[in-house]
Amino acid sequence: MPTLTSYFGFLLAALTITSALFIGLSKIRLI
């Protein structure tokens, strides 16, 4: 099912962006 694949892809992208933002904020806070 392409819809399920696209949904999981979107979820993975959102999770990656969120984690990257969190790591970036943590690094800025450490500096």
Swiss-Prot record:
It is a single-pass membrane protein. Keywords: Chloroplast, Electron transport, Membrane, Photosynthesis, Plastid, Thylakoid, Transmembrane, Transmembrane helix, Transport. Signal peptide: none annotated. InterPro entries: Cyt_b6/f_cplx_su6. Its main location: plastid. GO terms for molecular function: electron transporter, transferring electrons within cytochrome b6/f complex of photosystem II activity. GO terms for cellular component: chloroplast thylakoid membrane; cytochrome b6f complex. The chain crosses the membrane at residues 4-26. The keyword Nucleotide-binding does not apply. GO terms for biological process: photosynthesis. Pfam families: PetL. It comes from the Eukaryota. It is found in: Plastid, Chloroplast thylakoid membrane. HAMAP family: Cytb6_f_PetL (MF_00433). The 4 large subunits of the cytochrome b6-f complex are cytochrome b6, subunit IV (17 kDa polypeptide, PetD), cytochrome f and the Rieske protein, while the 4 small subunits are PetG, PetL, PetM and PetN. The complex functions as a dimer. Belongs to the PetL family. Component of the cytochrome b6-f complex, which mediates electron transfer between photosystem II (PSII) and photosystem I (PSI), cyclic electron flow around PSI, and state transitions. PetL is important for photoautotrophic growth as well as for electron transfer efficiency and stability of the cytochrome b6-f complex. This is Cytochrome b6-f complex subunit 6. It comes from Aethionema cordifolium.
